[in-house]
Amino acid sequence: MADLKSTFLDVYSVLKSDLLQDPSFEFTHESRQWLERMLDYNVRGGKLNRGLSVVDSYKLLKQGQDLTEKETFLSCALGWCIEWLQAYFLVLDDIMDNSVTRRGQPCWFRKPKVGMIAINDGILLRNHIHRILKKHFREMPYYVDLVDLFNEVEFQTACGQMIDLITTFDGEKDLSKYSLQIHRRIVEYKTAYYSFYLPVACALLMAGENLENHTDVKTVLVDMGIYFQVQDDYLDCFADPETLGKIGTDIEDFKCSWLVVKALERCSEEQTKILYENYGKAEPSNVAKVKALYKELDLEGAFMEYEKESYEKLTKLIEAHQSKAIQAVLKSFLAKIYKRQK
């Protein structure tokens, strides 16, 4: 794994160098420095799970055959395209949410001299994906499918973000709009497609597969993405911020979180009143009341039960798949996220 990570980081250096020398733009020393700093901070700064999982998935689809140097480079490059996509989403997401930290560091727009320039940086990150795809995949038989895939997933994610933002619109804080169904829709589109389906879809295309023949794989991965986001919602409230690498703000931000939806299902009339009065307010005393209510309603227990049921359901779906190679890909994904702490 350490070896794969160092190979993966070497490919990042190649891709970054390509972009810093892009012939379509005359860079000044200052603009090249800005771009390099922005890329290192936002693209390279994450856990790299999504990107690395393209390489892992492709290896598993090759069923133990060693990858050629070219296959290794291309699978890493596709992994980095997903990391670029993630960086683009997060840079803009943090501005929209007015977040403070990301990955244990100040959000990019909070850095001195960055501010709203971060919006243009987000646009650049989005454009880089297609420059990488064009440079390294243009001659591949699956190039058009790759471009379509990235466009489709970006569109789905932006629509998920839209539902999230309009559901949690600041001027209309109405908890009655929140339900498990709305939560699922937001998560499916905003997180599951790009975080879970996209890495495996990239590996399948590289392996010469037609994605239309793998809708069952998409279904399992979307379900896995929903489980992952429910974990995220749980950790936002119950995990230690040091371990998590960020300060959870779902309560303050009036997020349509799995916890608040479950709380609404379990609340008495009196408890509902407490939730309505305190949810979505930034004062520490309001946040503390919501957290105390979550404890009272035993949402930790509800989450443990949900986690167990999800794991069993996903395992059953995976084991029903006819391809052992695809089973291995899906099992490796599930193993990475089951009972995670951050």
From Swiss-Prot:
The gene is FPS2. Disulfide bonds: none annotated. Pathway: Isoprenoid biosynthesis; farnesyl diphosphate biosynthesis; farnesyl diphosphate from geranyl diphosphate and isopentenyl diphosphate: step 1/1; Isoprenoid biosynthesis; geranyl diphosphate biosynthesis; geranyl diphosphate from dimethylallyl diphosphate and isopentenyl diphosphate: step 1/1. It is an enzyme of class 2 (transferase). The keyword ATP-binding does not apply. Keywords: Cholesterol biosynthesis, Cholesterol metabolism, Cytoplasm, Isoprene biosynthesis, Lipid biosynthesis, Lipid metabolism, Magnesium, Metal-binding, Steroid biosynthesis, Steroid metabolism, Sterol biosynthesis, Sterol metabolism, Transferase. Isopentenyl diphosphate binds at K47, R50, Q86, R103. GO terms for molecular function: (2E,6E)-farnesyl diphosphate synthase activity; dimethylallyltranstransferase activity; metal ion binding. This is Farnesyl pyrophosphate synthase 2.
